[in-house]
Amino acid sequence: PNYTEAYNNLGIALKEQGELELAIQAYHKAIEIQDDFAEAHNNLGQILLLLGYFRQGWEEYEWRWQCRNFSIGQRNFPQPLWNGSNLQGKSILVWAEQGIGDEIMFANLLDSLKKISNHIIVECEIRLVAFFQRSFPEIQFVPRENPPNSRLLNSNIDYQVPIGSLGQWLRPDEDSFNQNRQSYLTTCTDKSEQIKKRYQSLAADSILIGISWKSTGAKQKQTLSKSTTL
């Protein structure tokens, strides 16, 4: 009855079955027994976000950094962590986290951040630098390196924040999502046209439908859970 791992695993199983409310109860029980059980907090946060309980969900999601199996470690930048304070006249460093798909998903938050800060620097996966720079020309993008680019260690930068943590300040409720439903990524026009012509020539008069995404870094189980059948 006091085995926290069992309650956490029960929560995972219930979530897989679509029993989200019961999963929440299981995670709460695990946390009741061990209040610093990071995995249960993180799992609870993801379900709360899924159900639209955004404020509490984002708060629980912050436990991800303390999870034993969280694949991407924190970046140790010297600037203070941004806590949602006024950014007028301030600069902020945003560092991307997790996989390339997560970086693209969380980039949706950058448009909202632009509205409250005029000086934003983003550290991201090198393959996304040109893509993001084209999509957000007002923001400076720097490829992720180890150790970090020395420019990002500058004490003149006022704050730093992981990109996934922007949600608790910029997406606190359903209205904040509804107000930011516009597209935010810009493709390369020339390359898009080249690809379009190539497949049109191959398809002749047939209808073209193309959707392709493969997560090479994910485990097979995770990949299957993110995929759909044809």
Where are these regions (language model features)?
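Alpha-helical solenoid repeat scaffolds of the TPR/TPR-like class and their adjacent stem/linker regions
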Residues: P1-L230
